[in-house]
A protein has these predicted regions:
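Conserved CoA-thioester-binding segment of acyl-CoA-metabolizing enzymes
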Residues: 1-59
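An acidic, glycine-rich surface segment that forms the CoA-thioester-binding/catalytic face
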Residues: 37, 41, 68-95
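Glycine-rich loop at the start of a catalytic domain that most often binds anionic cofactors/ligands
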Residues: 59, 63-69
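Phosphate-coordinating loops and pocket residues in cytosolic domains that bind phosphorylated ligands
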Residues: 27-30, 64, 73
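Short N-terminal binding/cap micro-motifs at the start of the first secondary-structure element
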Residues: 25, 61, 92-95
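Generic detector of intrinsically disordered, low-complexity, polar/charged segments
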Residues: 53-55, 61-62, 80-83
Length: 95
């Protein structure tokens, strides 16, 4: 499946998840959080996936964190149950 804000590469038991918003230093906004939540849901369900590496595109930053510019521009702020980047509250993910 293709994603708008991330690139997924699968190599045997490894997933490489590349944040893909280099124009915003890979800062995460609500749509990206939702997308990453889906990605990590799929990673968790995949019995052949053992390890995920999260990296960022571009040469300025891995990730600037929360996209404050999106928020200041009035972007809709929503959270996902699995936490920031679809990952920080995912206590049941033991890969």
């Amino acid at each position: 499946m293709a994603y708008e804000f991330a690139i997924i590469e699968k190599k045997e038991h490894l997933w490489i998840i590349t944040l893909n918003r280099p124009e915003r230093m890979n800062a995460l906004h609500s749509p990206a959080h939702k997308e990453l939540d889906e990605i990590f849901n799929n990673f968790q369900k995949d019995n052949e996936a053992w390890v995920a590496i999260v990296t960022g595109s571009g040469d300025r930053a891995f990730s600037a964190g929360n996209d404050l510019k999106y928020q200041a521009e009035g972007g809709k702020m929503e959270s996902v149950p699995s936490g920031f980047a679809g990952l920080t509250s995912r206590y049941d993910l033991n890969k």
